[in-house]
């Protein structure tokens, strides 16, 4: 069972919602720059590029440790980074759902929102 957070932007006409899975993100850990580009988080892209440039100029002894630190930090904090980005763009936390999959979380959310 996973925890999913549902975010809604009430200022949009179509009222689309975004489902975020809490926990470690392998995609964000392994493809940090591409993950940030996909979600249009330009500040995160700039910080990631600068951090990778710093990692390449560090002494060889610490280079591996710094790269592992970057990978793990992106993996663990990807959901938090995305939540912060959504909050800054007028999205609000609508619901928290425990489900087996993203589709099940979406169905549970739609069932709850219809009953309200």
UniProtKB/Swiss-Prot annotation:
Membrane-topology annotation of the record: Single-pass membrane protein
Main location: membrane
GO cellular component: membrane
The organism's place on the tree of life at top rank: Bacteria
Keywords, sorted A to Z: Membrane, Transmembrane, Transmembrane helix
Membrane-spanning residues: 58-78
Cellular localization per UniProt: Membrane
Keyword Transmembrane: yes
Protein name: Uncharacterized protein RP318
Organism, scientific name: Rickettsia prowazekii (strain Madrid E)
């Amino acid at each position: 069972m996973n925890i999913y957070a549902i975010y809604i932007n009430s200022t949009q006409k179509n009222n689309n919602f975004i489902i975020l899975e809490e926990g470690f993100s392998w995609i964000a850990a392994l493809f940090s720059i591409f993950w940030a580009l996909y979600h249009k988080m330009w500040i995160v892209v700039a910080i990631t590029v600068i951090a990778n440039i710093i990692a390449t100029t560090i002494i060889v002894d610490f280079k591996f440790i710094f790269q592992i630190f970057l990978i793990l930090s992106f993996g663990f904090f990807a959901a938090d980074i995305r939540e912060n980005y959504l909050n800054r763009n007028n999205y609000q936390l609508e619901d928290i759902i425990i489900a087996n999959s993203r589709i099940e979380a979406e169905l549970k959310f739609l069932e709850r929102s219809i009953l309200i």
